[in-house]
């Protein structure tokens, strides 16, 4: 298989969405969905690590969610609700006309994969969740602050292209996620930035720095989890606090889940520990359980 993916586009929900494709579209499909402020090429190192271990992936696609990568931005922050991101995944699978598929998601992408697998259990063969056990629930009293933050975000002042080099963009990523190695951060900068006038900026919509989704209730999320039917692998980083507050409670609700930590990894496991992650995910994909 050629390790350089081909970029494809499709029209969905009034937006032109991008995805990256490897292999033969006539074969069984594996779908990769990134997290917030990330993009489809974030899977490159992990995907290559899976192939080196003999995982028989002959067709794979990695979606750029709306507002990320080379996908278009919606005209309003209301276009970044859970249902909006979920419809991107549903639209891609409808466009590919391939089911059931194995779907692999990180963070926000994992939440969308979970919701999709619960809504359409017959369309998902296997589910891999990286640093995600579904969307965050918020207490009722938090929702007004989330709405206010989203409204304030409309008035953000953005330096159009703040980075003088790819290395500068990579360092900005590592300030937030210091466990991402230099090589991986630079790879993300190469594929995740736009260049204009001698300077760089990350491709994602700047509004995504704010909480743009109005949270679901814990009861609603648990109802989705109870509908899951396929084999599930949940992987988390031992150095990550993401989802830590609900990890124990939510994990008990999953009917068919295997839960495995990656030692020394933070939130961005595919960037930080692609080889170790592939060691964990490979037997699940090879055996289906």
Identify the role of each PLM range:
Residues 1-31, 51-59, 98-100, 282-289:
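Alpha/beta-hydrolase fold catalytic core
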Residues 18-73, 250:
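Conserved HGGG/HGGXW glycine-rich cap/lid loop of the alpha/beta-hydrolase fold
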Residues 99-143:
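Conserved hydrolase catalytic core segment
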Residues 265-274, 278:
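Catalytic histidine-centered segment of alpha/beta-hydrolase-like enzymes
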Residues 159-219:
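Conserved alpha/beta-hydrolase catalytic His-Asp/Glu region
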Residues 130-133, 137-162:
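A catalytic-pocket lid/entrance helix-loop region that shapes and gates access to the active site
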């Amino acid at each position: 298989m050629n390790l350089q993916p081909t970029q494809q586009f499709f029209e969905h929900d009034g937006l032109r969405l991008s995805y990256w494709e490897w292999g033969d579209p006539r074969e069984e499909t594996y779908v990769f969905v990134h997290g917030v402020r990330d993009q489809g090429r974030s899977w490159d190192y992990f995907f290559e690590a899976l192939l080196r271990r003999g995982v028989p992936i002959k067709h794979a696609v990695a979606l750029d969610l709306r507002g990320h990568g080379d996908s278009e931005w919606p005209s309003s922050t209301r276009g970044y609700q859970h249902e909006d991101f979920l419809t991107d995944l549903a639209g891609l699978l409808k466009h590919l006309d391939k089911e059931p598929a194995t779907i692999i998601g990180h963070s926000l992408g994992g939440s969308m994969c979970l919701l999709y697998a619960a809504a359409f259990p017959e369309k998902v063969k296997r589910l891999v969740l990286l640093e995600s056990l579904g969307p965050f629930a918020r207490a009722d009293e938090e929702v007004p602050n989330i709405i206010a933050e989203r409204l304030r975000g409309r008035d953000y002042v953005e330096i159009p292209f703040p980075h003088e080099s790819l290395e500068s963009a990579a360092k900005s990523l590592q300030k937030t996620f210091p466990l991402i190695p230099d090589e991986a951060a630079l790879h993300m900068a190469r594929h995740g930035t736009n260049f204009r006038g001698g300077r760089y900026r990350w491709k994602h919509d700047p509004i995504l720095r704010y909480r743009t989704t109005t949270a679901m209730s814990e009861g609603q999320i648990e109802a989705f989890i109870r509908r899951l039917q396929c084999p599930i692998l949940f992987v988390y980083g031992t150095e990550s606090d993401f989802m830590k507050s609900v990890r124990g409670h939510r994990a008990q609700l999953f009917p068919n889940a295997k839960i495995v930590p990656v030692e020394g990894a933070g939130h961005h496991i595919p960037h930080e520990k692609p080889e170790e992650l592939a060691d964990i995910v490979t037997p699940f994909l090879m055996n289906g359980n």
